[in-house]
Curated annotation (Swiss-Prot):
It is found in: Cytoplasm. Gene3D superfamilies: 2.30.30.140, 2.40.50.90, LOTUS domain-like. Found in a mRNP complex, at least composed of TDRD1, TDRD6, TDRD7 and DDX4. Found in a complex containing CABLES1, CDK16 and CDK17. Interacts with CABLES1, CDK17 and PIWIL1. This is Tudor domain-containing protein 7. It comes from Pongo abelii (Sumatran orangutan). Keywords: Cytoplasm, Differentiation, Phosphoprotein, Repeat, RNA-binding, Spermatogenesis.
Length: 1098
């Protein structure tokens, strides 16, 4: 198949797994997570990814939202429609520990190899029949234990809406338990809704309700994202909930509420409502039992908690107040005339400013007027509409509340009420009535001011959400909008509905009078309808803030309308964040200008460090090949330019100190300058400060993040470092800003820069200048160990070297120099550049450098300091690099003897179950499992390896195949098995704890210390039981991979195949996904169903 056709086919599969489309910046990450490769648009001849997508309209449909976000959708394809349904229903884009954040976001997570989810002691443990047979599918008891338990989903967050632990089995045997799991929409798989009937029947066979075995387990309440659905009638739902609570005056468990709601109204209660009760004090009182359970108790709202903002929309009628003397009406009392009747009803309702139940009207009427209430009056309430307002509850004509239409002056009402009721509680009630009356008067005077309860905006639960930066006045208050289905997409849907409502409803008219703080619907530019809040008012114009966009504007009153409550269920989308690391300079005009120019109007990945009212965040630009830390970029941009070192071409610099030499020949130098002198003085002051001050908790780094600048004590003095990678809560990578050295340290070894020195320290730019030796080929990769060692021995930490600059490459940030030691300056023929080419360090490739020297052309005195290099220089150098390295390896015999291997990892016996994690899945015939109970030990070992090898001296050892070593793979050290030595200086290794095959440079392989040989190797090769297929297509493998990879599961062991080598052990298992609240998904059944569907298509 041609590459273009294959890319189109895989692209269609990726897009079909996202019903709501994929944002353009996320598409590459989603494609790679499924296929392992990037979309090859450049190889196909397109300059950008968007250009390629627009060239395949039969595969991709591109839409641009009002916020400027480009979203890609799959075009319909009849051939793969049925496959797409299966892929879509199992798609999971929420990576738990992958190297990518938010699929496309390559942000360094705080704990990248720490697993999220918690199956240990919480997964449903299966019971087994004693007659287990290896040859057939086991006859299992229900996988979910019966009894009291609070299940923690291993792949999701759990809501606090669980049954209280004091409830026994009998208490909820007949009542369905409602649980709400908050995850991204495309991350959930509901078999009831998406699977075909045969599979639904199978998956529901173990749907026994249960609670957790571990009653004492603490479950953290998550931040729950408000639902995107906001079209339900909030008023009606709130009134129904009040009715339920009024029937249960002694309280009701929140977990039982959905059941009673459905039983009474024949509708399902929107699960997002359960998270908003704490914000509805006018509807209910929420109480958490002191017994420590996760369930909450709901009570009817307390009258004293009624707020003015809620009395408008939630008109709860007070009970009719009895008169001072109650006399039953006489049987022979006269009947009131029709004209007088309406007038008397209007006068009566004034007494009940919070409303009167229609059913209570006859009794109150007869008690007050001593006349008989007309029998047919209640059957025709509409006839009273000209003297009172009628509010029908739940659409039931038998349940209505009557309100006075023309209230009397407020002072008279208050006076009468105080005379009739003297006790304190009644006075409090009258105060509430007075507030209600004020609003009624304001409404009748056309000066209505609306106070509407809007749910607060919840911070997304995903690791690295996308945000659109709107504007900022300082870096502590950056206005942003979250981009995603429950945020920007939900907002656009709401605005479309607002446009339809206000454009086609002739009854809505512009507001006549507004008040500061009032919420409105504003007809903005391009006929868009937006939610807004009044900031100030003028004669014909009002200044409003668009609460979903974060900016303000003056609009005409004729464009402002009363906001309908049904558009208030979605949180205000504009919110604020604080940029981490920039707090001390938050108001600096130069910094604000830089941040504004780099961020406003653009979409970024955001790493949320602290989920406070104003979250502390780091922004990342992920639009290029590398992620750019915006916070760090802005900080570097405002450094004091006068303290920078500006190297001039052909200039000579003396007293230069070489501070670091990398394995590719790159070196870092310090050149004497004003900035270096100021840095030295400042570090001395800090040394004195720490010497005189007792170390407190404020001095330690409590919240490490990438780009943060802090201090590290090294060789008796404090030095500036920048955090470059956070491995875990204990270990991280740092780069010394003023020497270029990179190492791993413990978080506890770092210190905060004292506040009094912080601003000065930030202003000083990094003093390490990146250089390379002129006239040496730059594309040869790693130097030979002997060449690097010779260079280090010659100049490293020598403080009186000299350099001559031949070229400054601004784009790469590197200077090409000639380097001299003190005794050889300024003889050009004795420079380090010439010595390293003449030294016996490249004996296997002398032609690389010796044949490259041209008389005169390479002289430091020449204006053109670049040598002419033969065309095959780099090729020959790379070709012979392996031979040089091998010889070097053999010259340094290893001081490590072959150590004993750790014992094999413990596996359950056939017929038993175990909790596992799947780090790698190729297809059902080959995947890797890790015992969940041991993972925390592996995390500790990984941390210790990072710290140990970051400070250990690099050893040159003779490597052998099929031996165990430590290898550095993507900034982490792993225990590996060497599988082979390639001809390009790389070696193939197998990660013994994670089951991955990697290629690493041979220089990154080190002896495995004895202290890291105790823990058994954690990766165990596995095969899925219960499936007959032996050959798996790429599509089937992709489906399986997305179902199990990076997930905690329950494994039922069928067979264990032992081997002398622990990495050759194999296990055949059934896998069960228990992340759904009431259904266990057997992976082999799911794959069998997929194969059946695939065969129908083919």
């Amino acid at each position: 198949m041609l590459e273009g056709d294959l890319a189109s086919k895989m692209l269609r599969a990726v897009l079909q797994s996202h019903k709501n489309g994929v944002a353009l910046p996320r598409l590459q990450g989603e494609y790679r997570s499924l296929t392992g490769d990037w979309i090859p648009f450049k190889q196909l001849g397109f300059p950008t990814l968007e250009a390629y997508l627009r060239s395949v309209p039969a595969v991709v449909r591109i839409e641009t939202s009002r916020s400027g976000e480009i979203t890609c959708y799959a075009m319909a394809c009849t051939e793969t429609a049925r496959i797409a349904q299966l892929v879509a229903r199992q798609r999971s884009s929420k990576r738990k520990t992958g190297r990518q954040v938010n699929c496309q976001m390559r942000v360094k997570k705080t704990m990248p190899f720490f697993l999220e989810g918690k199956p240990k002691a919480t997964l449903r443990q299966p019971g087994f029949a004693s007659n287990f047979s290896v040859g057939k599918k086991p006859n299992l008891a229900p996988l979910r234990d019966k009894g009291n338990s609070a299940v923690v989903k291993p792949d999701a967050e759990i809501s606090p809406c669980m049954l209280h632990t004091t409830l026994g089995n009998e208490a909820f045997k007949d009542i369905p338990v409602q649980r709400h799991v908050t995850m991204s929409t495309n991350n959930r798989f509901s078999p009831k809704a998406s699977l075909q009937p045969p599979l639904q029947m199978h998956l529901s066979r173990t749907s026994t309700k249960e609670m957790s075995d571990n009653l004492n387990q603490t479950v953290e309440k998550p931040n729950v994202t408000p639902p995107a659905s906001y079209t339900y009638k909030m008023d009606e739902v709130q009134n129904r909930i009040k009715e339920i609570l009024n029937k249960h005056n002694n309280g009701i468990w929140i977990s039982k509420l959905p059941h009673f709601y459905k039983e009474l109204y024949k509708e399902d209660l929107n699960q997002g409502i359960l998270q908003q009760f704490e914000h509805w004090p006018h509807i209910c009182t929420v109480e958490k039992p002191c017994s420590g359970g996760q369930d909450l108790l709901l009570y009817p709202a307390k009258r004293k908690q009624l707020l003015r903002s809620e009395l408008d929309t939630e008109k709860v009628p007070l009970s009719p107040l009895p008169g001072p003397k109650q006399t039953p009406p006489l049987k022979g009392c006269p009947t009131v005339m029709a004209g007088d009747f309406k007038e008397k009803v209007a006068d009566l309702l004034v007494k009940y400013t919070s409303g009167l139940w229609a059913s209570a009207l006859p009794k109150a009427f007869e008690e007050m007027y001593k006349v008989k209430f007309p029998e047919d009056a209640l059957k025709n309430l509409a006839s009273l509409s000209d003297v009172c307002s009628i509010d029908y509850i739940s659409g039931n004509p038998q349940k209505a509340i009557l309100y006075a239409k023309l209230p009397l002056p407020t002072d008279k009402i208050q006076k009468d009420a105080e005379q009739a009721h003297g006790d304190h509680d009644i006075k409090a009630m009258v105060e509430q009535e007075y507030l209600q009356l004020e609003e009624n008067i304001a409404e009748s005077a056309n000066t209505f001011m609306e106070y509407i309860t809007v749910p607060p905006l919840m911070i997304p639960t995903e690791a690295s959400p996308s945000v659109l930066v709107v504007e900022l006045s300082n870096t502590n208050e950056v206005v942003i909008r979250y981009v995603g289905k429950d945020y920007s997409a939900a907002q656009e849907l709401m605005e479309d509905e607002m446009k339809e409502y206000y454009s086609k409803n002739p009854k809505v008219t512009p507001v006549q009078a507004v008040n500061v703080g009032q919420l409105l619907a504003v007809n903005a530019e391009e006929d868009a309808w937006l939610r807004a809040q009044v900031i100030s008012t003028e004669e014909n114009k009002i200044k409003v803030c668009y609460v979903d966009y974060g900016f303000s504007e003056n609009v005409e009153k004729s464009k402002a309308y009363k906001l309908n409550p049904k558009f208030c269920s979605l949180s205000f989308q504009a919110t604020k964040c604080k940029l981490a690391g920039l707090e001390v300079l938050s108001d600096d005009p130069d910094l604000v200008k830089v941040v504004e120019s780099l961020t406003c109007g653009k979409i970024f990945a955001v790493e949320i460090l602290d989920k406070a009212d104003i979250p502390l965040v780091v922004l990342y630009d992920t639009s290029g090949e590398d992620d750019i830390n915006i916070n760090a970029t802005c900080l570097k941009a405002i450094c004091d330019k006068s303290l920078e070192v500006h190297l001039q071409v052909d200039a000579m610099y003396t007293n230069v100190k070489v501070t670091n030499i990398c394995s590719d020949g790159t070196l870092y130098c310090q050149v004497p300058c004003k900035g270096l002198n100021k840095l030295s003085d400042l570090l001395r002051k800090i040394e004195d400060y720490f010497h005189c001050k007792h170390m407190t908790s404020e001095c330690f780094v409590s919240l490490p993040f990438c780009g943060k600048i802090c201090l590290f004590h090294c060789k008796g003095k404090w030095l500036r470092v920048e955090i470059t990678n956070v491995h875990s809560s204990r270990a991280l990578d740092v780069q010394f800003l003023d020497s270029g050295t990179v190492t791993s340290v413990k978080v506890s070894e770092l210190r905060e820069i004292p506040p009094r020195f912080l601003q000065e320290m930030i202003a000083i730019p990094p003093q390490a200048i990146k250089c390379c030796l002129a006239d040496l080929p730059q594309s040869i990769g790693m130097w030979t160990p002997d060449a690097v060692l010779w260079l280090r021995d010659s100049v490293l930490n020598c403080s009186d070297c000299s350099i001559k600059v031949t070229k400054v490459d601004e784009t790469r940030g590197i200077a090409h120099v000639y380097l001299f030691t003190p005794k050889n300056f300024p003889d050009p023929h004795r420079s380090i550049n010439r010595q390293i080419t003449n030294a016996d360090l490249w004996k296997h490739q002398k032609d690389v450098f010796l044949s490259a020297i041209s008389s005169g052309a390479g002289s430091p005195n020449s204006k053109n300091g670049n040598m002419r290099v033969s065309g095959d220089t780099g090729e020959n150098f790379r070709k012979n690099l392996t031979d040089v390295i091998k010889k070097s390896m053999m010259d340094h015999t290893s001081s490590f003897s072959t150590e004993e291997l750790p014992p094999p990892v413990h596996l359950s016996k056939p017929g038993e179950h175990m909790d596992v994690y799947v780090p790698v899945a190729c297809h059902p015939g080959y995947f890797v499992i890790q015992p969940w109970q041991e993972i925390h030990k592996l995390e500790v070992l990984m941390e210790e390896m990072i710290l140990y090898y970051s400070v250990s001296e690099e050893r040159h050892i003779a490597v052998e195949k099929d031996q165990v070593y430590a290898a550095k793979v993507e900034n982490k050290w792993h225990r590996v098995l060497l599988k082979g030595i390639l001809t390009n200086g790389l070696v193939s290794v197998y990660e013994l704890d994670y089951g991955k095959h990697e290629l690493v440079n041979i220089r990154k392989v080190q002896p495995l210390a004895d202290m890291f040989r105790k823990l058994p190797f954690q990766a165990v090769t596995a095969q899925l039981a219960g499936v007959k297929c032996t050959q798996w297509s790429e599509e089937a493998s992709m489906v399986f991979r997305n179902r199990v990879e990076k997930k905690p599961l329950v494994a039922l062991v069928q067979t264990v195949i032992e081997n002398a080598n622990p990495w050759d052990r194999k296990v055949v298992v059934y896998l069960v996904d228990t992340s759904l609240p009431d259904t266990d998904i057997w992976i082999h059944d799911f794959m069998s169903e997929y194969l059946i569907e695939l065969s129908k298509v083919n």
